[in-house]
Amino acid sequence: MKILRKNHPLLKIVNHSFIDLPTPSSISSWWNFGSLLGVCLMIQILTGLFLAMHYTSDTTTAFSSVAHICRDVNYGWLIRYLHANGASMFFICLFIHVGRGIYYGSYVLSETWNIGIILFLTTMATAFVGYVLPWGQMSFWGATVITNLLSAIPYIGSTLVEWIWGGFSVDKATLTRFFAFHFILPFIITALVLVHLLFLHETGSNNPSGLNSDSDKIPFHPYYTIKDLLGILLLLLALMILALFFPDILGDPDNFTPANPLNTPAHIKPEWYFLFAYAILRSIPNKLGGVLALILSILILATFPLLNTSKQHGLIFRPITQTIYWTFIANLLVLTWIGGQPVEYPFTTIGQIASITYFTIIIILMPVSNTIENNIIKL
């Protein structure tokens, strides 16, 4: 009797992707975050779908509809807090996933890496438009400030901003289209995830040693399905602790006040996962320069395959680059902290130093350390 999963046209694809997939036997828990991101995406789509059933994308009722979800809908408060804190868990997993890719040299699989960058940007866009939907003070002013950055584009900037707003300010038309974008983008992300996996399975997974693992592969199921299951349980535990015990810890108190175009909050800031890019944006006095730096802070990830000159794969046997890598992580944490601080001395100066360091490490220090380590190997 033929095995169904190996012969059925549809099940065969699933089998080659998740069951009989040859996987390096040495991959560590840092490789769990890909599957955790998949789980986060499913949680976000499901909770988002239930929220969309009760939400109204109208400036007069949006804030009230979110309050209604929390007060009157069965377990509405739980669905809302799972969705809001699920976004934070999503970005934590995303940052670790990208960090692991840099540390272990996964960027040499350039197609997978580039699709990953597109996924990162799409996820950031989804989170941004989602943050506008509750129509609180920070939602409104965050949308106004960030969309207004496009006015820095020469010639077409002002027209472009008004086109995105659907008027002369952030208003009903803006909220309606942002809701439409927030609904459709997760499905685009899902399609991109499939392309990401397709490219990954063309080459096979990387592994911690950075060596060729063709001679040492094991089937994905049951070894890594069980391992992923443990990761998923820990993720759900962390999400539940966050949603049930500290639901508002990562939110902004200003967002409990309905949007008021006549009253600007003292400190306009985005969600915590955008603060590093926001700090880079604010550290440049010129508006257009700030916007370019903001975009480059993400797109610079695409330079990793191009600037990599190392004869070794990953950083596991490269102490100099390891030191630079962990300096880079510390620098990112500093940027995140600065992004949440007011625009005053000494925070502006620290932000400028951290922003320069961010780009210097990637463009100059890492390639230089690659060359030094290559020369050390020759000795």
UniProtKB/Swiss-Prot annotation:
Binding, heme b b562 = 83, 182
Query: Which Gene Ontology BP annotations are present?
Result: mitochondrial electron transport, ubiquinol to cytochrome c
Q: Which cysteines are joined by disulfide bonds?
A: none
Its cellular-component GO annotations read: mitochondrial inner membrane; respiratory chain complex III
User: Where heme b b566 is bound, by residue?
Assistant: 97, 196
Protein topology in the membrane? Multi-pass membrane protein
Annotated GO molecular function terms are: metal ion binding; ubiquinol-cytochrome-c reductase activity
How the cofactor is bound: the record states:
Binds 2 heme b groups non-covalently.
Summarize where a ubiquinone binds, as residue positions: 201
Keywords, A to Z, come to:
Electron transport, Heme, Iron, Membrane, Metal-binding, Mitochondrion, Mitochondrion inner membrane, Respiratory chain, Transmembrane, Transmembrane helix, Transport, Ubiquinone
**Which cofactors are named for this entry?**
heme b
Q: Which regions span the lipid bilayer?
A: 33-53, 77-98, 113-133, 178-198, 226-246, 288-308, 320-340, 347-367
Thylakoid is among the record's keywords: no
Q: Extract the Gene3D superfamilies matched here.
A: Cytochrome Bc1 Complex, Chain C
The UniProt entry, under PANTHER family, shows: CYTOCHROME B
Additional comments on file?
Heme 1 (or BL or b562) is low-potential and absorbs at about 562 nm, and heme 2 (or BH or b566) is high-potential and absorbs at about 566 nm.
Function of the molecule: Component of the ubiquinol-cytochrome c reductase complex (complex III or cytochrome b-c1 complex) that is part of the mitochondrial respiratory chain. The b-c1 complex mediates electron transfer from ubiquinol to cytochrome c. Contributes to the generation of a proton gradient across the mitochondrial membrane that is then used for ATP synthesis.
Q: What is this protein called?
A: Cytochrome b
Which species is listed as the source?
Answer: Akodon albiventer (White-bellied grass mouse)
Q: Lineage from the top down?
A: Eukaryota, Metazoa, Chordata, Craniata, Vertebrata
